[in-house]
From Swiss-Prot:
Domain of life: Bacteria
UniProt entry keywords in alphabetical sequence: Plasmid
Listed InterPro entries: DUF1468
Name the UniProt record assigns to this protein: Uncharacterized 16.3 kDa protein in TAR-I ttuC' 3'region
Organism annotation: Agrobacterium vitis (Rhizobium vitis)
Entry-linked Pfam families: TctB (PF07331)
Amino acid sequence: MTEQQQGSRRDVVAGGIFIAIAALFAIQGSRYEFGTATQMGPGFFPVVLAVLLAIFGAFTMIAGFRKVPEAHDGPVSWRALVLVCLALAIFGAGARPLGLVPVVVICTFMSAMASRKNTVFSAGVMALVMAVLCFVIFKIGLAVTLPTFGPVFGR
């Protein structure tokens, strides 16, 4: 197989991983009541997100097959790997005690700083915008029961 025919192995593998994760979430989500768009059951959100992730994975794989591979993938970005994984762990552990707004600010800031292209200012702006969007969508729009500011802040 020539280099042109091989495509971007990273994108193909990433697309496959997205599809596999989507399949797991779709299977687990289908065990719950689905409901409707206006009366969402507990299985609605995981299944819909799984379908979207599978579509994204398919597009990523197709793009990977069409792309000319890079000569050198470069070293692993340990900074990005550690910051993103740590942000996910903080979100999981800190959502209830910290509340929606603080945990979104912290996790978005950390994830944005994983890229060396972002400045502290741009990461801060992203974090604040994401916190406002999450508040509007999840607290006002969907009435999620997660506290806006958790018990750590005396609420």
